[in-house]
Regions:
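Conserved N-terminal phosphate-binding loop of PLP-dependent enzymes in the Aspartate aminotransferase
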Residues: 1-389
Length: 389
């Protein structure tokens, strides 16, 4: 009989020649458990997904309750059902008044695609600006605005009229003109190794977009739902995006994302032509129920307000065991190594000792650290002890 590893390598499409190959049987809270009794602490939250931890009882209960009623009824946007409406109502309570219309999707990259279409449709323009070392997804439109030629080159030609700007460079802002449909920006460039936007830069960018009539699309797929110390990272900067992208930590572990805009703007996708953006599984009722439960957990346990304090505590503990620079935005951290080899060695050491850490897509010299927001100090110490060399 073929092993699970053999089957995985030969029949499950691979994204890299060297997958991690951890065989996980179950997960609870901040821990993953292997088939042979191995115990790992998830120090990356499944890449910014498990903000409330794995299999949170409230999320599991919501999934079980909704799945006993119905799991799919019709393609997106046709039927009225409670999980979708309740989730939208809850989001209204934590967002600025202008962001009041929600298009739920299955993944972050789908949210990006929808936002790009909406921007082009609403402005009648074609140019999309984004930033070097930015990541917004891997489908064709999102790939076109990705901030790395390394990952784009093999798939050219991509969507035309893309303007690549340098992040945190105020002189670049003037390149956003009345030809620009939208500027897509991360408040924290996660895949660059945790690079925070400068306050003045982001505020000036928002002003320029308003001045020339370009839409400001803020990507909070990794930073949203408490990861940076507020519910959304843009709140630190006193700006309001025209379109907001959310995903990853949104669903409590289930696949759901969204692009969010003002109702008047979002209506542009409903006519000329009708069905301007459609999806079969978007706003899946089970995923909506999970997302609502996850949001309720974050609010009830004040996880978003505790993330800064916990992140600072974790940073102080890491500083005692690594003599390297550490970057941090709330509970998003990176350890800066001198070489890629040093970083990969550290990541492998962590996994071998039960601590799952990883590298970044556009910064192979940095170690990614971002545990679930529910992590306790005792659990931090469990990881720190095992990361000590």
């Amino acid at each position: 009989m073929r092993s699970q590893r053999h089957f995985f390598l030969n029949h499950i499409a691979q994204t890299t020649p060297n997958p991690l190959m951890l065989e996980i049987e179950s997960a609870q809270g901040v821990f993953l458990y292997g088939k042979n009794g191995e115990k790992y602490i998830d120090f990356i939250s499944g890449i910014s997904v498990s903000n409330v931890g794995h299999c949170h009882p409230k999320v599991v209960e919501a999934i079980q309750h909704q799945s006993s009623k119905f799991m799919h009824l019709m393609v997106y946007g046709e039927y009225i059902y409670t999980p979708q409406n309740k989730l939208a109502e809850a989001l209204l309570g934590i967002l600025p008044d202008a962001l009041n219309s929600f298009y739920f999707t299955n993944s972050g990259t789908e949210a990006t695609e929808g936002a790009l279409k909406l921007a082009k449709r609403a402005t009648g323009r074609y140019e999309i600006a984004s930033f070097k070392n930015a990541y917004h997804g891997s489908t064709a439109g999102a790939l076109s605005i990705m901030g790395s030629d390394t990952y784009k080159q093999a798939f050219r030609p991509l969507i035309p009229d893309h303007l690549m700007l340098h992040f945190n460079d105020i002189n670049e802002i003037q390149k956003v003109t009345n030809k620009t449909a939208a500027v897509v920006v991360e408040v924290v460039q996660a895949e660059a190794g945790i690079i925070k936007a400068d306050l003045i830069f982001l505020q000036k960018l928002a002003e320029q977009c308003k001045k020339v009539g370009a839409l400001l699309i803020v990507d909070e797929i990794q930073t949203g739902f408490g990861r940076t110390g507020l519910m959304f990272a843009f709140e630190h900067y006193r700006i309001v995006p025209d379109i907001l992208l959310i995903g990853k930590g949104f669903g409590g572990g289930m696949p759901i994302a969204a692009f969010i805009a003002n109702q008047d703007l979002m209506k542009e996708l409903s006519f000329n032509p009708i069905l301007g953006h459609i999806s079969t599984f978007a706003a899946n009722p089970v995923c909506c129920a999970a997302a609502l439960a996850s949001l309720e957990v974050i609010l009830a346990e004040k996880l978003h307000l505790l993330a800064e304090e916990k992140g600072k505590l974790l940073e102080s503990k890491l500083e005692k065991i690594v003599d390297k620079p550490i970057r941090r935005a709330g509970m998003m951290l990176s350890i800066q190594h001198k070489t890629m080899e040093d970083n990969f060695s550290y990541c492998n050491f962590g996994i071998e000792h039960g601590v799952i850490v990883d590298w970044f897509l556009f910064n192979e010299k940095a170690t990614r650290i971002g545990p679930p927001l529910i992590i306790s100090e005792e659990e931090m110490d469990w990881a720190i002890e095992r990361l000590t060399r």
